[in-house]
């Protein structure tokens, strides 16, 4: 074995599950797999036998090489950002988001100018990630994607995120993904019964749809207008060994193609979800549920609820149960709310 390097298995992301199972007893104890360019890089603590090597090369399309251990995500204790700034003496962002093996920073402090790389290296080491990216252009358009600049680390914006027992492959430069909704996705998934038909109107890479299918076994139809999200959703269905119906296009039009009356509709598009309620109501069965996600200040929520009630009533339907929940604070005094409706 060469000095100061680790043996690494590199293979296509679609073979992730088989690779992890096959290499479990050989996997490194302190280094985690890395993801880049639609491939997984699995560091090993010891070489597998000849039979295993032949299997992963022939059946999983793998290659074996040697790489520096420093480039891999680490299994380690993370220091809070507030404590980190005190200990390292460089300006640290107030918040950062872990997605798979990368760290996302929305904004750097003003004092960070000229020290971006230094800050990136500090964050890279503290969080034990493959790369750190800074948002340089806000989410825009109906596809909700942003532009990112790499502060430190290696590889591209592709990663694989583990959440609620599921794998989600994604590219942050091509799709929208919010890991902070992990608990909310579990809350909704645990409400779904096996005999339901669920429509996810803005499904992204499938975190709601795939988890619901995996936990409940219900029929699920997932819609998204972003072609990249649809491709990732198809891959993620395979990674998680579930089968869901996937439609690409404008949810207002595609929802007419679902083929069944929905028992539950998920509308996770906080910027514009209310605009799509007309379309959702048209396929919702009696006593069905709609989960509408909206951005709102506390003092604006009541008017949003009245607006939703008016839309439902315009279709000669009646809301028989309504409640709202705070999901996440997105800026001072502005939140993502989920408005839960049951409609007769």
Per-segment meaning from a language model:
Residues 1-344:
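SAM-dependent transferase fold signal centered on methyltransferase-like domains
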């Amino acid at each position: 074995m060469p000095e100061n390097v680790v043996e690494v298995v590199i293979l296509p992301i679609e073979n992730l599950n088989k690779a992890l199972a096959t290499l479990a007893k050989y996997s490194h104890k302190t280094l985690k797999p890395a993801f880049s360019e639609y491939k997984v890089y699995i560091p090993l603590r010891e070489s597998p036998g000849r039979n295993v090597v032949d299997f992963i090369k022939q059946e999983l399309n793998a290659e074996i090489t040697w790489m520096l251990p420093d480039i891999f995500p680490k299994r380690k204790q993370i220091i809070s950002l507030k404590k980190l700034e005190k200990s390292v003496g460089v300006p640290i962002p107030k918040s950062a988001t872990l997605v798979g093996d990368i760290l996302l920073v929305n904004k750097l402090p003003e004092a960070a100018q000229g020290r971006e790389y230094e800050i990136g290296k500090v964050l890279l080491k503290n969080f034990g990630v493959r790369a750190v990216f800074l948002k340089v252009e806000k989410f825009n358009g109906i596809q909700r994607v942003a532009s990112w600049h790499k502060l430190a680390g290696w590889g591209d914006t592709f990663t694989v995120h583990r959440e609620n027992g599921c794998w989600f492959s994604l590219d942050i430069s091509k799709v929208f993904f919010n890991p902070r909704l992990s608990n909310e996705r579990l809350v909704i998934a645990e409400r779904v019964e096996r005999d339901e038909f669920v429509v996810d109107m803005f499904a992204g890479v499938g975190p709601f749809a795939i988890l619901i299918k995996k936990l409940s076994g219900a029929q699920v139809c997932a819609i998204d207008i972003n072609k990249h999200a649809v491709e990732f959703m198809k891959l993620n269905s395979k990674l998680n060994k579930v089968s869901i119906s996937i439609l690409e296009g404008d949810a207002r039009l595609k929802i007419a193609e679902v083929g069944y009356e929905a028992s539950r509709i998920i509308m996770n598009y906080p910027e514009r979800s209310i605009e799509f309620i007309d379309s959702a109501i048209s396929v919702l069965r009696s006593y069905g549920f709609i989960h509408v996600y909206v951005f709102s200040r506390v003092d604006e929520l009541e008017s949003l609820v009245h607006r939703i009630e008016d839309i439902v009533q315009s279709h000669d339907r009646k809301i028989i149960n309504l409640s709202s929940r705070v999901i996440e604070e997105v800026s001072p005094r502005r939140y993502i709310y989920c408005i839960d409706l049951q409609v007769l």
